[in-house]
UniProtKB/Swiss-Prot annotation:
Pfam families: HD (PF01966), HD_assoc (PF13286). This is Deoxyguanosinetriphosphate triphosphohydrolase-like protein. Transmembrane segments: none annotated. GO terms for molecular function: dGTPase activity. SUPFAM superfamilies: HD-domain/PDEase-like. PROSITE patterns: HD. InterPro entries: dGTPase (IPR006261), dGTPase-like (IPR050135), dNTPase_2 (IPR023023), HD/PDEase_dom (IPR003607), HD_domain (IPR006674), PHydrolase_assoc_dom (IPR026875). Keywords: Hydrolase. Belongs to the dGTPase family. Type 2 subfamily.
């Protein structure tokens, strides 16, 4: 049974465009299915998480990462008697707005858009789901419930100060209450993302030989598992060792998250969802010690992995591709597909830049490489 402060699909605030409910799925299950059936969701399988798609068959991409986040989010929500369907749905959608080539691609596109209010993958996720996906005759987007859209936009907390242009524009017709916290389910999705990416980026980085087990000594709370497993299993293989370490790490983080969140709920005597939204801090959280460990792990990954020679070299090529494509389309909009060119408002520069950014952001790694080779490159790029 759902807790009194859970997001109940039977009490959803509904959709921007009214629809008749189905008898065999609740509203959040329906949204989950709509997201899975989008073109944007399918494209995630060819978008970079950390390692370029064709570098290896077992490295994570945006799709596998989103699936892993959704399983963590669903488990945590279920344990707390919250809506596992809502938590899962927000988790599945949280990366839809990412560019090709991961964070390097986003930084490059944001730089290209500097004079045009920049680029945000979070706002792009909202734009995809409310405008760019064309699947229904009656409206643009996929007409998701208020709770899912709120969770996607605010899963990292209230939006205060300067608001992204598209989020502000959409909010005029469907008020997402940007200054408050999102539901507990959305907060779970955000922290499930942290759990998944720090654990699995460590795993993939060891698999790619960017770091090794000795370097994990810098992270004492993780290294203790390495020492324990090596002592218990004398002949354990490296592949099995990293899997066991990651498994223990995920369990440890989830257990900590559940304990602290229950403490917060009890301390605040939460009885309904509005109390969660109107708190001055997020109700779903890790303990102070674990937050410190996570911060140290993110710093470790940034310094030892994301800034490594291998990833830096790849990032430079990715930046060149994204910026090259942006320039060539800005110079000649006739190179865009007809259906995209039609979206430009009378060849006005700002409109042109935004449409081009939407087009590039939707590309997969391989399609961006293909387009770059065809339109920009004097030296053919096949892989990195």
């Amino acid at each position: 049974m759902l807790a009194s402060y859970a997001s109940d699909p039977l009490k959803s605030r509904g959709r921007l465009y009214k629809e008749i409910p189905t008898s065999y799925r609740n509203e959040f299950e329906r949204d989950r299915d709509r997201i899975i059936h989008t073109n944007a969701f399918r494209r995630l399988q060819y978008k970079t998480q950390v390692f370029i798609n064709h570098e290896g068959d077992h490295y994570r991409n945006r799709l596998t990462h989103s699936l892993e986040v959704s399983t963590v989010a669903r488990s945590v929500a279920s344990t707390l008697n919250l809506s596992n369907d809502l938590a899962e749905t927000i988790a599945l959608a949280h990366d839809l707005g990412h560019t090709p080539f991961g964070h390097a691609g986003e930084r490059a596109l944001n730089e290209c858009m500097r004079e045009y209010n920049g680029f945000s993958h979070n706002a792009q996720s909202l734009k995809i789901l409310t405008l760019l996906e064309k699947r229904y005759a009656a409206y643009n987007g996929v007409n998701l419930t208020w709770e899912v859209l709120e969770g996607i936009v605010k899963h990292n907390g209230p939006i205060l100060g300067e608001i992204n242009e598209y989020i502000a524009e959409y909010n005029k017709q469907n008020d997402l209450e940007l200054s408050t916290y999102a539901s507990a389910e959305a907060q779970i999705a955000a922290l499930a993302d942290d759990i998944s990416y720090i654990s699995h980026d460590l795993e993939d980085s060891i698999g790619a030989k960017i770091i090794d087990f000795n370097s994990l000594a810098e992270l004492k709370y993780i290294d203790q598992h390495v020492v324990e497993l090596k002592s218990k299993f004398k002949n354990i293989s490296s592949s099995c060792l990293i899997y066991e370490v990651v498994r223990k790490l995920i369990h440890e983080l989830i257990t900590d998250l559940l304990w602290q969140t229950k403490e917060n709920l009890n301390k605040e005597k939460i009885t309904n969802i509005d109390e969660i939204r109107n708190l001055n801090y997020q109700i779903v959280d890790f303990t102070e010690k674990t937050n410190k460990n996570i911060k140290e792990t993110k710093k470790f990954l940034h310094e030892r992995v994301y800034k490594s020679n291998k990833i830096t070299a790849i990032s430079l090529k990715c930046t060149k591709i994204v910026q090259g494509l942006f320039k060539v389309y800005m110079d000649d909009i006739n190179l865009l597909p007809v259906n995209w060119k039609m979206l430009i408002d009378s060849n006005e520069t700002y409109s042109k830049a935004r449409v081009i950014a939407d087009y590039i952001a939707g590309m997969t790694d391989r399609f961006a490489i293909q387009e770059y080779n065809q339109l920009c490159s004097t030296s053919y790029i096949t892989c990195f």
